[in-house]
Amino acid sequence: MTLAASSQRSQIIRSKFRSVLQLRIHRRNQDCTSDSDPWISASGPALAPALPTVPASFLVSPGVLSPEPAYCPWRAPKKESPKNSQHWKEPKVRGNLTYHLYMPPEQRQGPRANLQVERSTLGPPDPPLWEKNSQRPHPRMKPSSAGVSSPSPPSHKLELQTLKLEELTVSELRQQLRLRGLPVSGTKAMLLERMRGGTPPRERPKPRREDKEAAAPWPRLKPKALGTTRLPSTVKASATNRRLKFSGATDPLGAAPAPASVPAPTPSPALAPTPTPAPVPAPAPAPFPTPPASLTLEEELQEAIRRAQLLPNRNIDDILEDQVEPDDLLPPVPLDFPGSFDLLSPSPDSEGFSSVFSSSLPSPTSSLSPSPRALTDSLDWLEALSGGPPLGSGPPGPSIFSADLSDPSGSLLWELLPDPW
């Protein structure tokens, strides 16, 4: 078969199909009174034999076409299949569904509402059989009062299997204990014991203090307990040991050059409040009475230290051999430096800041003592402070601030300071 023959055959088939289609459209437009479908059956038996003659005329003259009949536009929209009409009308019926809106349980209707009502009347569902067999009833879950019990949540959330308790974390165990109304403090072992129904720590009897002392003490309470029990006895023992140490004859301080046979009266109360560098406190006269005619070794040492501080020019042997008399009192230590501290109004001796460092000594009458020995000691002490001759023997010399502290011949300033014994 050549190409021209195949194209001619396809053209004939196409023209035949077109003629049959035009014929059926023409018959449907002409039969306006009948409601039958022209695609299913013919309108009359007279037109049936004419069907095979029409394609024959087209085969003879394929290019000739029959004139198109008049078209009725008002007839076309009424010819619709009942299936198509139902298909397009069904979405309109389903469009009023309100499944996306929330409806309270009181307003629900239909089979779903009835199912929910039945579930609420039956109560919560029972746990499965395997869960019933593996779980034990918890003693804490029993109602202790006869009041109305609250509805219990689902059992699969609260109750846990005994074999799976060790696999839970501490946070999960505490959450379960909170839901059951149990305390959540403690270690994981304590939490597991509470979950299994053991005795909670609230109900355990508190151990007595005797039991605690018999057992190993807690390290945080051990120092405090020992400190409170040993404090009074330690203080009393230490005070007694110190008194015995200074009053004993084998004390190393007893070899001091101070003679113990020198009679001396009891010191006056003015000597008691003076500060001493020795760390040993003075013994109280009430528990250990001393004879009024002699001084104790500790008092003699304190008096020697005080005299050595106030009289730096004297030798230590002279101070120790000197007899202490009640009327022979040493002058008190002055709290202020000799000189005027008024910086605004200059003194008659000098002007400006030099008046602060000038040695304007007080009058001799203010520093006099009842004893001539005390007067001589005070004059020597003032001479040592001022670095010049005694009072009344000449013009005042340079003060202690202008003295050469590095001069070994003069009295040094740090000799006045109390040295540790």
Swiss-Prot record:
Subcellular compartments: Nucleus
Compositional bias per record (Low complexity), positions renumbered to this chain: 347-372
Gene it is expressed from: Mamstr
Spans annotated as Disordered: 104-156, 188-296, 322-406
Transmembrane segments: none
SMART domains the record matches: SAP (SM00513)
Protein name, per record: MEF2-activating motif and SAP domain-containing transcriptional regulator
Biased composition (Basic and acidic residues): 191-214
Keyword presence, Transcription: yes
Regions of compositional bias (Pro residues) in chain numbering: 260-292
Annotated organism of origin: Mus musculus
